């Protein structure tokens, strides 16, 4: 098409094109190697498309019809990979029409050029190094065309996977066609001394070989073991996990269950790699100081999962840690089913976590009724189970002699205090609860019974009681908390799952949660967690049934809680709360699926 001097001067355009191709495949290979399976990011298509434009120009300038034609086809397929993920993807028929139109336009252009332009041919062989090579015979040109055809078929293979298998990926047949076609093309261009194409097809063999090696690893990957990894990081998660394991062992006794769990899970023939208690930290500084140990345990966990390759991974609540684990497993090529039990509080803060759930999970188990609306338009499969505490509390048989066993006085009625399970919870929340009790009119008419979630911290409870001179007080072990809820006049409870338990036990409750200054600052001004209600019963019904005192020292004082105690001591206020608690129970149990149905969905359906 152009005089020889201009053709030689523009020859580096092909090298420039190959720079884009090489960068695209380097990015693809880097991500594939990191994740352990074939990955094709969007930047791959943009870089390849840019390279294709330069290569089409190179084909016209160097009078190489097959190069211009095949890279035009590839350019359209690159475009299709980006277009199909857009809001307005074109139909397949239009893409096919575009391919035919481009093929016609390029063929006609070369036909006209070869007829009327003296320097243009259908398949020139630029010898930029001026090697003493004889002109390629018809047989060699035929070999070159066969190689180019096979090499370009790879993107038609990719297009097939894209349209009919809905996979914007580079499958093993793509790399096989690349390797075979690229090898033939390399021989041809070595024969003709075409430096650009020698570099193009020679370097192109490396990503083909590397990706085929990964594909072969995938083919011989260790099959799934008949096991299930389950992880819970908090007491509430341990309760859920214990109930889940009980149902699992009854329905699937041969499945080996291992992971992270507390006492209730460990009591269900569960192999704990780590005790749940080793992951329990709260508050900014506690989490910061515990990060090295948490990171070490996280590393051991995901490596153990990849080594064991369980059929299913079930993460219970504890979202920040579990999201990190789930992302790592997927990035390292874990193909099993991943289930998250308990939806993170995306309705309260960090709604972007919904995208993470949709991207990495196969199934999300919901326990709160209002969460169903959050995913009604989502592709993520969800199952609403209802809150398991509802059934637990409904079937609970109280110990009628619990007060005698604990040698509790019976001369006065009592108020219950549930300060929380962590050391920091006890030091902050119990102090407020005790001070409020002491400042109220109930101090002279009632005993204060403090529920202890962790016997290790009983001495802290005693210290707080003694420091505030709360003489009419006693400690009640957590195993008697439901008896305590049912027989107390009303309760003071730290915001959390315990508040839902008091509601389901029809216990009138005042909610307290005193935060440290740093936690208050982060919640208000960094994470912007400002809600009309924070305790689950209030959120479920969409109205305030339990008074809430939540925040830092400037947000409320113990005198405010004491005033609420004086109001709640009236029988009318207590009955009003109990009626609302019955509404909570009804809302939780409407349209809930059974655990047996859920387990069938997890273990008897494909991912």
From Swiss-Prot:
Record carries keyword Cell membrane: no
InterPro entries (UniProt xref): Glyco_trans_19, Lipid_A_biosynth_N
Organism (species): Chlamydia trachomatis serovar D (strain ATCC VR-885 / DSM 19411 / UW-3/Cx)
Function summary: Condensation of UDP-2,3-diacylglucosamine and 2,3-diacylglucosamine-1-phosphate to form lipid A disaccharide, a precursor of lipid A, a phosphorylated glycolipid that anchors the lipopolysaccharide to the outer membrane of the cell.
Enzyme Commission code(s) on record: 2.4.1.182
Region (Lipid-A-disaccharide synthase): 225-607
Region (Unknown): 1-224
Pathway participation: Bacterial outer membrane biogenesis; LPS lipid A biosynthesis
Alphabetized HAMAP family for the sequence: LpxB
Family: In the C-terminal section; belongs to the LpxB family.
One GO cellular component term: membrane
Gene3D superfamilies per UniProt: Glycogen Phosphorylase B (3.40.50.2000)
Protein name per Swiss-Prot or TrEMBL: Lipid-A-disaccharide synthase
SMART domains, A to Z: LAB_N (SM01259)
Alphabetical keyword list: Glycosyltransferase, Lipid A biosynthesis, Lipid biosynthesis, Lipid metabolism, Transferase
GO biological processes: lipid A biosynthetic process
Reaction catalyzed: a lipid X + a UDP-2-N,3-O-bis[(3R)-3-hydroxyacyl]-alpha-D-glucosamine = a lipid A disaccharide + UDP + H(+)
UniProt-recorded Gene Ontology molecular function terms: lipid-A-disaccharide synthase activity; phospholipid binding
């Amino acid at each position: 098409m152009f005089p020889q001097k201009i053709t030689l001067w523009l020859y580096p355009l092909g090298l420039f094109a190959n720079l884009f191709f090489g960068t695209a495949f380097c990015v693809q290979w880097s991500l594939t190697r990191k994740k352990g399976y074939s990955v094709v990011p969007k930047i791959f298509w943009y870089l390849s498309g840019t390279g294709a434009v330069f290569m089409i120009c190179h084909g016209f300038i160097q009078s190489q019809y097959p190069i211009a034609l095949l890279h035009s086809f590839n350019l359209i397929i690159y475009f299709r990979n980006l277009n199909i993920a857009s809001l307005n993807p074109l139909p397949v028929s239009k893409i096919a029409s575009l391919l035919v139109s481009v093929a016609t336009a390029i063929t006609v252009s070369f036909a006209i050029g070869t007829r009327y332009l003296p320097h243009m041919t259908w398949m020139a062989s630029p010898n930029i190094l001026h090697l003493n090579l004889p002109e390629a015979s018809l047989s060699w040109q035929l070999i070159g065309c066969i190689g180019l055809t096979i090499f370009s078929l790879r993107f038609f293979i990719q297009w097939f996977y894209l349209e009919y298998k809905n996979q914007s990926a580079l499958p093993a047949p793509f790399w096989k066609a690349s390797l075979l076609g690229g090898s033939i093309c390399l021989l041809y261009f070595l024969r003709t001394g075409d430096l650009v194409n020698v570099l193009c097809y020679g370097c192109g063999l490396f990503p083909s070989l590397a990706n085929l090696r990964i594909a072969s690893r995938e083919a011989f990957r260790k099959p799934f073991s008949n096991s299930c990894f389950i992880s819970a990081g908090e007491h509430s998660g341990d309760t859920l996990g214990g109930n889940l394991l009980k149902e699992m062992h009854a329905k699937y006794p041969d499945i080996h269950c291992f992971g992270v769990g507390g006492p209730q899970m460990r009591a269900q023939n569960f192999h704990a790699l780590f005790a749940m208690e080793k992951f329990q930290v709260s508050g900014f500084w506690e989490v910061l100081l515990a990060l090295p140990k948490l990171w070490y345990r996280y590393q051991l966990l995901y490596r153990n999962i990849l080594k064991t390759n369980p059929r299913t991974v079930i993460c219970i609540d504890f979202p920040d840690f579990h999201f990190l684990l789930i992302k790592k497993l997927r990035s390292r090529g874990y193909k099993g089913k991943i289930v998250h039990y308990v939806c993170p509080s995306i309705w309260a803060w960090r709604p972007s976590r919904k995208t993470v759930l949709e991207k990495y999970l196969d199934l999300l188990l919901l326990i709160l009724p209002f969460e169903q609306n959050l995913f009604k338009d989502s592709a993520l499969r969800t199952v609403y189970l209802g809150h398991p505490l509802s059934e637990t509390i409904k079937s609970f048989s109280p110990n009628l002699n619990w007060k005698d066993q604990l040698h509790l006085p019976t001369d006065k009625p009592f108020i219950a205090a549930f300060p929380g399970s962590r050391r920091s919870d006890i030091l902050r929340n119990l102090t407020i609860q005790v001070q409020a009790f002491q400042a109220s009119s109930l101090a002279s008419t009632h005993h204060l019974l403090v529920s202890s979630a962790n016997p290790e911290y009983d001495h802290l409870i005693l210290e707080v009681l003694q420091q505030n001179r709360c003489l009419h007080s006693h400690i009640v072990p957590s195993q008697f908390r439901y008896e305590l809820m049912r027989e107390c006049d009303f309760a003071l409870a730290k915001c959390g799952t315990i508040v839902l338990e008091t509601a389901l036990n029809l216990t009138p409750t005042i909610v307290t949660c005193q935060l440290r200054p740093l936690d208050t600052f982060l919640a208000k001004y960094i994470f912007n967690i400002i809600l009309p209600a924070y305790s689950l019963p209030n959120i479920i019904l969409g109205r305030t049934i339990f008074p809430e005192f939540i925040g830092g020292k400037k947000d409320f004082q113990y005198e405010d809680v004491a005033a609420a105690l004086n109001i709640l001591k009236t029988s009318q206020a207590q009955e009003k709360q109990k009626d609302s608690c019955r509404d909570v129970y009804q809302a939780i149990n409407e349209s809930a699926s059974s655990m047996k149905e859920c387990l069938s969905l997890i273990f008897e359906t494909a991912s």
